[in-house]
Amino acid sequence: MTESERALLTFEQLFDTSRAIYKKQKKILEIVLEPFDITVLQYLLMFKIHQSGSTPLSKLAMSLDLKPASVTRMTDILYKRQLMNRYDSPDDRRIVMIQLTEEGEELIEKAAVQYAKMGAGLYQKLDTSQLQYLRKLAGSLTKLAEGCSEKSGN
């Protein structure tokens, strides 16, 4: 087997594994979010805001790799449900800032706890050293992927 064939096989295995894990995690998250009546994307949007506090809408769109119009539609829905607030940036009125309401923060916290409980089963057969290695490897792969996307202009 040539070096390029080994690299391709490794890439295919990594891609298949990543996709399988993503599908399982997404399914768990969908089950958790059903009683809250929000989608996975809405949850991810709210989680990003939860992590960073008050955030410009354009920055959210970039971090989720979505078009600003899609993020605007999602924030409209969540705003109507009183899960987030929108306001103009004090530095530049053209910039729309998004912030979770107290109700939005509570929803994120409740959903995160339930997701952690259900998602733990996905990794329960791994011991502590395997989990630590997985975290380290995931971090390295994320940095590698970010470096590749910067070089390609994505």
Swiss-Prot record:
One of this protein's Pfam families, by short name?
MarR
Fetch the PROSITE patterns from UniProt: HTH_MARR_2
SUPFAM superfamilies, alphabetized: Winged helix' DNA-binding domain (SSF46785)
Going by the UniProt record, its keywords in alphabetical order are: DNA-binding, Transcription, Transcription regulation
Q: Superkingdom of this entry's organism?
A: Bacteria
Keyword DNA-binding recorded: yes
* GO function terms (MF aspect): DNA binding; DNA-binding transcription factor activity
Record-linked InterPro entries: HTH_MarR-typ, MarR/SlyA-like, WH-like_DNA-bd_sf, WH_DNA-bd_sf
Q: Quick check: keyword Nucleus in the entry?
A: no
Q: Where is the HTH marR-type domain?
A: 1-143
> Gene3D superfamilies attached here?
Winged helix-like DNA-binding domain superfamily/Winged helix DNA-binding domain
Query: Which residue ranges hold the DNA-binding region?
Result: 57-80
Question: Example GO biological process term?
Answer: regulation of DNA-templated transcription
> Could you tell me which cysteines form disulfide bridges?
none
This one is known as Uncharacterized HTH-type transcriptional regulator YhbI
Q: Which organism is it from?
A: Bacillus subtilis (strain 168)
